[in-house]
C-alpha cells in the first residue's frame, strides 16, 4: 500500500502558507489601537502573543495552525504543537493549557491519520508540561492543524519585540533552512531528519535562559523568515540591525535545496516585503538573501542578548533598516 502523502493535499506547507506580511498588515491596519486598560501587549506591534494583566500575572494567548509540512501525520502533529507553543516561549512565558484546532477532509483522508496528528500534538504538549484539552474540528477540503495556547509570565520580565536596544548582540537559537527542505520534501518525498528534529525541538530552554539572564527583547523566527521577523522587531523598537550572514546557522542540506531551486513562494514574498529595508554588502548574493528570508516553521528564537551555546549573528544599532554583511 502506498503511504499517504499529506503534503500533496495542501497548496502550501507549514508557516510558508501564511498570508504575506504586507497583505496581512494592510488587512488589520484599522484594528490596531483597540486595547483595554489591562492589555500589556496588543496588536499594534504584531508581537508573538497577546498579553493581559490578570492580578499580578501576565496571561498570554496565541493561536497557530497550518497545512501539512511533512507527510508523516505524527510528525506533523508534533511540529504544529511545538510551533504553537513557541509563541508563548517567545514572550518569556510558560504554557499552561492548549486546545486543538483541526480541519480535516473527512471524505478523502482516513480519520486514523487525524488521530495520529492529534497524538503527535499531545506528545509535544506532554513534553512541555502543557495539558492539551479538547479543541475544535471542522470538515475542511485541506487538512490543517494547530493549537490555541494559554500561558503565564511575570509581567515585569516579558520578552517583547519592541524592547530591542542599540549595542546589544543578536542571537539565533535554531538553524535556518527548514523552509527549503520542507519544500523539497513536498515536491520529491525526500525526508530530512535534521529538519524534523529542529522543528519538533521546543524553544522552552532557550526562552528560560533568556529570561534568567535579563533579556528584554525576543521573537521567534517563523513564516516571515529571519529578515521579516527582525524587521518587525526593529520597526517596533525604532532601531536598526546588522546581520553577519556567515554567522547565521544553516542546516547544510538546505544549501543544496537552495542551489536546486526549492524556494517557496512564501520565501520570495518575504524578501519582496523586506527588501526596501535592506542595505547589503557588495558580495551579498540573491541566494544569501533568500536563505535569510526562508519561511521557517517552528524556528528558533531571535534574542537581543547573548545565550550560552547559541551563535551571535549580529547586533542592534541606532537608526533604521537592516545591514546584511
Language-model region placement:
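Short pre-catalytic strand/loop immediately N-terminal to key active-site residues, enriched for Gly-Thr
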Residues: 74, 191-198, 216-217, 287-292
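Acidic-glycine-rich active-site phosphate/pyrophosphate-binding loop
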Residues: 50-61, 200-206, 271-282
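Small-aliphatic-rich amphipathic alpha-helix that forms the alpha element of a beta-alpha
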Residues: 73-99, 116-127, 202-213, 226-232
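Active-site glycine-rich loop that binds ribose-phosphate moieties when present
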Residues: 148-158, 190-211, 284
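N-terminal glycine-rich phosphate/pyrophosphate-binding loops that anchor nucleotide-derived ligands
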Residues: 1-90, 165-171, 311-315
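Glycine-/charge-enriched secondary-structure boundary and capping motifs
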Residues: 1-12, 23-26, 37, 106-131, ...
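Glycine-rich anion-binding loops of enzyme active sites
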Residues: 54-70, 78, 94-191, 315
Amino acid at each position: 500500500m502506498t503511504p499517504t502523502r499529506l503534503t500533496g493535499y495542501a497548496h502550501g506547507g507549514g508557516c510558508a502558507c501564511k498570508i504575506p506580511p504586507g497583505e496581512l498588515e494592510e488587512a488589520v491596519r484599522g484594528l490596531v489601537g483597540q486595547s483595554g486598560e489591562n492589555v500589556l501587549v496588543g496588536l499594534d506591534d504584531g508581537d508573538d502573543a497577546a498579553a493581559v494583566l490578570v492580578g499580578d500575572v501576565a496571561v498570554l494567548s496565541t493561536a497557530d495552525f497550518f497545512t501539512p509540512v511533512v507527510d508523516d501525520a505524527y510528525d506533523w502533529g508534533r511540529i504544529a504543537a511545538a510551533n504553537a507553543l513557541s509563541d508563548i516561549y517567545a514572550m518569556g512565558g510558560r504554557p499552561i493549557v492548549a486546545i486543538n484546532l483541526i480541519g480535516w477532509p473527512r471524505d478523502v483522508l482516513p480519520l486514523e491519520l487525524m488521530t495520529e496528528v492529534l497524538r503527535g500534538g499531545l506528545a509535544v504538549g506532554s513534553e512541555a508540561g502543557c495539558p492539551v484539552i479538547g479543541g475544535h474540528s471542522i470538515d475542511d477540503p485541506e487538512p490543517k492543524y494547530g493549537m490555541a495556547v494559554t500561558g503565564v509570565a511575570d509581567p515585569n520580565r516579558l520578552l517583547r519585540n519592541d524592547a530591542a536596544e542599540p549595542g546589544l548582540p543578536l542571537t539565533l537559537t535554531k538553524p535556518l533552512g527548514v523552509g527549503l527542505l520542507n519544500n523539497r520534501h513536498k515536491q520529491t518525498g525526500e525526508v530530512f531528519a535534521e529538519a524534523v528534529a529542529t522543528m519538533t525541538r521546543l524553544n522552552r530552554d532557550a526562552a528560560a535562559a533568556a529570561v534568567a539572564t535579563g533579556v528584554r527583547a525576543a521573537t521567534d523566527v517563523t513564516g516571515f523568515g529571519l529578515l521579516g521577523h527582525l524587521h518587525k522587531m526593529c520597526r517596533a523598537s525604532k532601531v536598526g540591525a546588522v546581520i553577519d550572514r556567515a554567522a547565521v546557522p544553516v542546516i547544510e542540506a538546505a544549501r543544496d535545496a537552495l542551489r536546486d531551486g526549492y524556494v517557496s513562494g512564501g520565501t520570495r514574498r518575504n524578501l519582496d516585503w523586506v527588501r526596501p529595508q535592506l542595505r547589503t554588502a557588495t558580495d551579498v548574493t540573491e541566494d544569501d538573501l533568500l536563505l535569510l528570508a526562508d519561511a521557517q516553521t517552528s524556528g528558533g528564537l531571535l534574542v537581543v542578548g547573548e545565550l550560552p551555546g547559541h551563535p551571535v549573528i549580529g547586533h542592534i544599532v541606532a537608526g533604521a533598516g537592516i545591514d546584511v554583511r
